[in-house]
Amino acid sequence: KPNGAFLSGNYLEYNVMPYGGLLNYGWLDKNLSLAGRILIKKKNTWNSKIIDFQKTVAVVPSVAIHQNDKANSNLDLNMQTDLQPVFFLSEKTSDWIDFLKKELKLTTETIGDYELFLYDNSKPELFGKKDEFLLSPRIDNLTSVCAALESFLESSSENIQVFCSF
């Protein structure tokens, strides 16, 4: 959301919007990173840059069980009040742009606009007695794209074929 930074106490948070099917509780207490596109102006020239922080920069904290006695029986999460990520301690919302500039090592450049996405930056890993299980964020999307692409590549159709993945 444009100008989405806000303060909750001394926490700088950012209004977010869901994309696609969202399993709300799955975002709680995860190490979240930020990636997307940012528009940067340097010497009167605007350039678009793809960015990926590749480290934890935010968390959507859950409430402790003693503060919500219905957490195990009725977890009803509101996108606008319960799922806002916390980025850092701050006293002013303008620190958001300063944060982006510092992380991207920008000095004199101006940040114009951006479209950023939070993602779970946990690393995939195998587990089980014989490492028979794979635990990975985004595995449902990755496997479906892989299966579709393999089918596309192995197809022997003489017709025009198109494969799109977003």
Where do the PLM segments sit?
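N-terminal hydrophobic/helix-forming segments and targeting peptides
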Residues: 1-166
